[in-house]
């Protein structure tokens, strides 16, 4: 079981930052399938991350062991023993209708990334782990899930209950932060 957000009297803002602190990419899971209520909460989290217009994002919640096994064999980057998958997809036709070419190439990807991020932050609050998977061929994923040509798979989220002794995350990750202009270090201004 992964660390979960402590049930304290902290403010909602503190709870969000604690969930961010606990966020991990898990690559080894137990064989136990997370409960339907947990998967429903992840779907809810993805829905709250909306960047694009309604109807652009589609989610496929995959729990059929045979289908998960097919994904495992067909997608080289897939986490080997995750018992569930959420496939985040974009409707390119609808995106083009309501937002034009930029909607297709930029907004759909931002929308899918936001959904993946919200799922990732929600996971430790539910006692589960996730891992974003992006190493696969679009056509293969479309074929596995029967996606029409105008539905593009964006991200596969491996979902499961992490093993007890999972590796600790790399500490100290921080992006390069600039102030006002590229090359001006943010820390020099504080």
Q: Language-model segments: what does each one mean?
A:
Residues 168-190:
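Phosphate/diphosphate-binding glycine-rich loops and adjacent basic-rich segments that engage nucleotide
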Residues 79-85, 146-169:
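A glycine-rich helix N-cap at a beta->alpha junction
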Residues 59, 136-138, 155:
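Residue-level "edge-of-site" marker
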Residues 90, 135, 161:
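Short secondary-structure boundary segments
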Residues 56, 128-132, 152-153:
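A short coil-to-beta-strand element that immediately follows conserved catalytic motifs
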Residues 1-85, 89-95, 188-190:
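N-terminal amphipathic, basic helical "cap/leader" segment at the start of enzyme domains
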Residues 46, 86, 102-144:
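Small-aliphatic-rich amphipathic alpha-helix that forms the alpha element of a beta-alpha
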């Amino acid at each position: 079981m992964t660390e979960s957000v402590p049930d304290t009297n902290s403010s909602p803002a503190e709870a969000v930052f604690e969930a961010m602190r606990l966020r991990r990419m898990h690559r080894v899971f137990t064989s136990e399938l997370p409960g339907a209520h947990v998967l429903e909460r992840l779907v809810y989290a993805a829905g709250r991350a909306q960047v694009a217009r309604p109807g652009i994002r589609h989610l496929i919640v995959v729990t059929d062991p045979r289908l998960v096994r097919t994904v495992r064999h067909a997608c080289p980057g897939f986490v080997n023993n995750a018992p569930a998958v959420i496939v985040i997809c974009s409707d390119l036709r609808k995106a083009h209708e309501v937002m034009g070419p930029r909607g297709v190439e930029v907004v759909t990807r931002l929308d899918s990334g936001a959904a993946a991020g919200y799922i990732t932050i929600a996971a430790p609050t539910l006692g589960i782990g996730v891992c974003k998977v992006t190493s696969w061929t679009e056509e293969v994923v479309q074929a596995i899930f029967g996606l029409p040509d105008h539905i593009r798979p964006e991200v596969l989220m491996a979902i499961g209950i992490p093993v007890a002794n999972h590796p600790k995350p790399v500490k100290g990750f921080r992006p390069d932060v600039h102030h006002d202009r590229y090359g001006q270090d943010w820390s020099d201004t504080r």
